[in-house]
């Protein structure tokens, strides 16, 4: 008698079949994350292209914002809903639009459509990096690094307006619209003097500096086995092997600064840490602005400048500029509020 020892073959369910199809080796990997990424990215990009091409902002901001109205690439935008809409999701079938697509576009429904699908698309892209890292067998630091721009997007476009009175105070999706939002942030929140913004700038510019230094150092220390060292003819662009010297790079920077990275792991972790931490700090700062937390205030300088016409600092100058932004921007930016500022309340510098 023959006895066969082994496990009984389990029946493959629908989950296994779908899993196999999603993870099949193809030119563009789909994966489970692709079920979130591709539809959301397609809808967000399509909504933005539709809005910038055809949809006006007359009913929400009193502005022209589409190619159809004569704007160019730098001035088109998908504008935020009107302040009166509050934090409504503005669903097409909701009480505001009532299934009317034209009305939905006019009241700013495309902005919430693009914002939420865009956020989900970015999250899907991060999950895609996690999924592929697991399948390939590498660490998920790419996905962790990508969490930084996701944090910035979510904090600026979603959390900040949730802390304010409506979606109206979020940035509209357009180049000039983002610039207007930056001026708004400075005038109403003194954003450049916020310590979290300072850390964000240090992280982004520090990351750019590290990237430039790293690339230049690798180019400087290239060599090719079997031939004389040459920076400019040291390698073929398609070669597989590494042909730069970490030892030489370490010696070079040790002579310049007195210190240098001792190994590639610490060097590349630092290049990851600096910009990612900077972006996360900036995101935390924006969450603080959603709660109307203040930046640095140097009251003693403001008090002395108010009492002494000859005393003025760059800080007090900036405070006056912020007051000017608020006074001149509010009537333009929020015409529905019908602000009126008499000339005597508009800010003036001490030299005027």
Swiss-Prot record:
Membrane topology: Multi-pass membrane protein
Predominant cellular place of this UniProt entry's protein: membrane
Residues reported to bind a plastoquinone: 214, 261
UniProt catalytic activity: 2 a plastoquinone + 4 hnu + 2 H2O = 2 a plastoquinol + O2
Keyword NAD: no
Gene Ontology molecular functions: chlorophyll binding; electron transporter, transferring electrons within the cyclic electron transport pathway of photosynthesis activity; iron ion binding; oxygen evolving activity
Assigned EC number: 1.10.3.9
Annotated binding of chlorophyll a ChlzD2, by residue: 117
Sequence positions that bind pheophytin a: 129, 142
Gene Ontology BP annotations: photosynthetic electron transport in photosystem II
Residues where chlorophyll a PD2 binds: 197
Keyword Thylakoid included in the entry's annotation: yes
TM region positions: 40-60, 124-140, 152-165, 207-227, 278-294
Ligand binding (Fe cation): 214, 268
GO cellular component terms listed in the entry, alphabetical order: photosystem II; plasma membrane-derived thylakoid membrane
Localization annotation: Cellular thylakoid membrane
SUPFAM superfamilies documented for this protein: Bacterial photosystem II reaction centre, L and M subunits
Enzyme superclass (EC): oxidoreductase
Cofactor notes: The D1/D2 heterodimer binds P680, chlorophylls that are the primary electron donor of PSII, and subsequent electron acceptors. It shares a non-heme iron and each subunit binds pheophytin, quinone, additional chlorophylls, carotenoids and lipids. There is also a Cl(-1) ion associated with D1 and D2, which is required for oxygen evolution. The PSII complex binds additional chlorophylls, carotenoids and specific lipids.
Keywords: Chlorophyll, Chromophore, Electron transport, Iron, Magnesium, Membrane, Metal-binding, Oxidoreductase, Photosynthesis, Photosystem II, Thylakoid, Transmembrane, Transmembrane helix, Transport
Subunit structure: PSII is composed of 1 copy each of membrane proteins PsbA, PsbB, PsbC, PsbD, PsbE, PsbF, PsbH, PsbI, PsbJ, PsbK, PsbL, PsbM, PsbT, PsbX, PsbY, PsbZ, Psb30/Ycf12, peripheral proteins PsbO, CyanoQ (PsbQ), PsbU, PsbV and a large number of cofactors. It forms dimeric complexes.
Family according to the record: Belongs to the reaction center PufL/M/PsbA/D family.
Function according to Swiss-Prot or TrEMBL: Photosystem II (PSII) is a light-driven water:plastoquinone oxidoreductase that uses light energy to abstract electrons from H(2)O, generating O(2) and a proton gradient subsequently used for ATP formation. It consists of a core antenna complex that captures photons, and an electron transfer chain that converts photonic excitation into a charge separation. The D1/D2 (PsbA/PsbD) reaction center heterodimer binds P680, the primary electron donor of PSII as well as several subsequent electron acceptors. D2 is needed for assembly of a stable PSII complex.
Additional information: 2 of the reaction center chlorophylls (ChlD1 and ChlD2) are entirely coordinated by water.
Protein name per UniProt: Photosystem II D2 protein
Species per Swiss-Prot/TrEMBL record: Synechococcus sp. (strain JA-3-3Ab) (Cyanobacteria bacterium Yellowstone A-Prime)
């Amino acid at each position: 008698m023959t006895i066969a020892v082994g496990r009984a073959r389990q029946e493959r369910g629908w989950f296994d079949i779908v899993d196999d199809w999603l993870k099949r080796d193809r030119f563009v990997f789909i994966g489970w994350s692709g079920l979130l990424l591709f539809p959301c990215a397609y809808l967000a990009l399509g909504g933005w292209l539709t809005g910038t091409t055809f949809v006006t902002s007359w009913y929400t901001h009193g502005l022209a914002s589409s190619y159809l109205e004569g704007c160019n690439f730098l001035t088109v935008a998908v504008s935020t809903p009107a302040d009166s809409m509050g934090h409504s999701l503005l669903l097409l079938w909701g009480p505001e639009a009532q299934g009317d697509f034209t009305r939905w576009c006019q009241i700013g429904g495309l902005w919430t459509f693009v914002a939420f699908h865009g956020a989900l698309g970015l999250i899907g892209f991060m999950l895609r990096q996690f999924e592929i890292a697991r399948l390939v067998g590498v660490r998920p630091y790419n996905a962790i690094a990508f969490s930084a721009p996701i944090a910035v997007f979510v904090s600026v476009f979603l959390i900040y307006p949730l802390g304010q009175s409506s979606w109206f105070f979020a940035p509209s999706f357009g180049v000039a619209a983002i610039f207007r939002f930056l001026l708004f942030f400075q005038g109403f929140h003194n954003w450049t003097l916020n310590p979290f913004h300072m850390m964000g700038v240090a992280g982004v510019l520090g990351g750019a500096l590290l990237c430039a230094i790293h690339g230049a150092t690798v180019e400087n220390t290239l060599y090719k086995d079997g031939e004389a060292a040459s920076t400019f003819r040291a390698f073929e662009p398609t070669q597989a092997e590494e042909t730069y010297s970490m030892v030489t790079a370490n010696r070079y920077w040790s002579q310049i600064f007195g210190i240098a990275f001792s190994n590639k792991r610490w060097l590349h972790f630092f290049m990851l840490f600096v910009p990612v931490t900077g972006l996360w700090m900036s995101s935390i700062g924006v969450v603080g602005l959603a709660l109307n937390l203040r930046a640095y205030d140097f009251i003693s300088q403001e008090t002395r400048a108010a009492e002494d016409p000859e005393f003025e600092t760059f800080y007090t100058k900036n405070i006056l500029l912020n007051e000017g932004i608020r006074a001149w921007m509010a009537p333009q930016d929020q015409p529905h509020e019908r602000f009126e500022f008499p000339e005597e309340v508009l800010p003036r510098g001490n030299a005027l």
